[in-house]
Amino acid sequence: MAKIGLFFGSDTGTTRKIAKQIKDMFDDEVMAKPLNVNRADVADFMAYDFLILGTPTLGDGQLPGLSANAASESWEEFLPRIADQDFSGKTIALFGLGDQVTYPLEFVNALFFLHEFFSDRGAKLVGRWPAKGYGFEDSLAVVEGEFLGLALDQDNQAALTPERLKGWLSLIAADFGLVLPA
């Protein structure tokens, strides 16, 4: 079994594409194939001590899900299914997608909600990312000048994504026991 679980929620498919880009950097022994949380069950999720989780931000800065007018179930519906799980001993890194131009007041807010959920259940969260180089006005996901995970804007800064992904994976490598490809 792979060492790292890679799960995502998505509405338009962009978060899935980023998850696939992350997976493509590692072989199957290191990282599992990305799995949409709308297809995951509790056992899938709890099988890993290391998790990389991705989410877009929808609506008014919400996690994706039916109440945010997502096309299908997502994080909003999955989190209650794992709410009684103990995440002590698990290391989690988050990445989030948002549009800082159209939604400058809630850019990648969904990162905050995932961070809070897993932190409250004992997980070790790693992978904070500098908030410099972005053009948003406000975000719940920024604490002391850093995002609570990797923030990506595929609508306005897609050209920066490969560099940001590589930098972020280097940042979390030690916590995940990863050796990055050259």
Curated annotation (Swiss-Prot):
GO BP of this protein? nitrogen fixation
Q: Which InterPro entries match?
A: Flavdoxin-like, Flavodoxin, Flavodoxin/NO_synth, Flavodoxin_CS, Flavodoxin_lc, Flavoprotein-like_sf
Cofactor dependence is on: FMN
Q: Which GO terms describe its molecular function?
A: electron transfer activity; FMN binding
- Say if the entry is tagged with keyword Nucleotide-binding: no
Q: Does the keyword Ligase apply?
A: no
Q: List the disulfide bonds.
A: none
Per the entry, what this protein does is: Low-potential electron donor to a number of redox enzymes. NifF is the electron donor to nitrogenase.
**PANTHER family per the record?**
FLAVODOXIN 1, FLAVODOXIN 2
Family, similarity comment: Belongs to the flavodoxin family.
* Entry protein name: Flavodoxin
Q: Which organism is it from?
A: Rhodobacter capsulatus (strain ATCC BAA-309 / NBRC 16581 / SB1003)
- Name the gene that codes for it: nifF
